[in-house]
Amino acid sequence: MKRLRDLTAVLGMVALTACNNASIEGSWVEPVPGMPGMQQGFVLDGDGSASSINMATLKYEAWKKVGNRLLLSGTSIGNHQNISFTDTLTIEKLTQDSLILKRGELLLKYARNNE
């Protein structure tokens, strides 16, 4: 009986661990402020490359996950100048279908885009 209880506990821990191992790779979108029905976001590819979704002046190029931080690098395209940047965001929550990032006091809520 004790072995069955121990086995059940171990299997439960394995199942919980598997549920919390959501991948950050993929397409993530959020609503565009002030533009109902429009979305913007980014794609995180498995090779460390990144790209922007519906953001003409913010071109993501690379990403890296370090602990609970997401580093997004790219180029900000402005009038007659391009500026390289790296955004450091704290990963507050990651599930199979949602990603919540924090930059300072700002919370950014993304949904996985499966299209």
Stretches found by the model and what they are:
Residues M1-C19:
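Sec-dependent bacterial lipoprotein signal peptides
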